[in-house]
């Protein structure tokens, strides 16, 4: 489908909506939608996402925002889709599919990935996306007290600027696509830990401000033991603060580790793909997402 084949206007309930590309001055519109659908994004979080992707807004005749959708190109043949929001009063009336079709047309030829809420799952399924994995959102106020013993073959140290090239390579192996622009933006606003083997980085975890507090991610590690060793120092530094992690890992021991720290089960989303499966079959895996929108 060509983008020019999709109408720039559509009737949504009593409104005639017009779609236009997202512009630099649309922060207020996009953040307004986040608040309307009860997403935790602060204005700073939306600003970061807008700097990394492109997308569309649907607005009515008096410039009220009705829906949004974004995509984030990573390398030459892959993209993440996210920030798909529709004003609560207009959900199920077709605005989401209308914008999704525009994004799919823009991304023709790319393998695509997204993380679907329960409410949006059927929309993406109808567009040809297939489920890949469940992502567990864990969050809470970090408790004071001992964590379960963490045993890893690699020592862990604080992330240094000189690590960044090696961390990009690790992330590409785990994620399945090159996303230098995303990582560089995250490095600029994050702290982190690095697992070291034979003097070289073997895994890493980042933490940054997001939503109600801070989010841990991405976390890239060889195994669960390395992932917990990377995360543990970040938890200890943030006792009494709100943290979140979004993870594929569903092992009882990993959940027990997070439970002990106060990061309780909150919600799940479904990772879905259109095109070939990427990542997950190399020496390192993603144990924590950078964000639902960025993977």
What feature does the model see in each segment?
Residues 105-118, 239-249, 269:
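Conserved GNAT acetyl-CoA-binding A-motif
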């Amino acid at each position: 489908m060509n983008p020019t084949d999709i109408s720039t206007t559509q009737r949504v309930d009593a409104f005639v909506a017009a779609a236009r590309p997202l512009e630099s001055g649309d922060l207020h519109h996009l953040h307004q939608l986040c608040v309307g659908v009860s997403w935790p994004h602060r204005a700073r979080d939306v600003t970061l996402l807008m700097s990394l992707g492109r997308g569309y807004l649907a607005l009515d005749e008096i410039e009220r925002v009705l829906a949004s959708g974004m995509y984030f190109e990573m390398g030459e043949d892959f993209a993440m889709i996210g920030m798909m929001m529709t004003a609560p009063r207009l959900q199920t009336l077709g605005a989401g599919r209308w914008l999704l079709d525009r994004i799919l047309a823009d991304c023709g030829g790319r393998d695509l990935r997204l993380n679907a809420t329960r409410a949006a799952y059927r929309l993406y399924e109808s567009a040809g996306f297939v489920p890949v994995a469940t992502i567990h959102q864990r969050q809470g106020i970090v408790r004071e007290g001992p964590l379960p013993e963490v045993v890893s073959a690699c020592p862990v140290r604080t992330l240094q600027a000189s690590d960044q090239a090696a961390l990009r390579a690790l992330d590409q192996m785990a994620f399945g696509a090159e996303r230098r622009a995303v990582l560089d933006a995250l490095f600029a606003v994050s702290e982190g830990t690095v697992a070291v083997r034979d003097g070289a980085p073997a895994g890493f975890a980042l933490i940054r401000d997001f939503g109600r507090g801070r989010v841990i991610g991405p976390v890239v590690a060889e195994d669960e033991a390395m992932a917990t060793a990377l995360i543990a120092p970040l938890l200890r530094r943030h006792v009494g603060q709100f943290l979140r992690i979004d993870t594929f890992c569903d092992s009882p021991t990993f959940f027990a580790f997070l439970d002990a720290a106060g990061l309780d089960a909150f919600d799940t989303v479904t990772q879905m793909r259109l095109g070939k499966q990427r990542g997950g079959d190399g020496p390192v895996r993603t144990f924590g997402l950078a964000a639902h929108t960025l993977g």
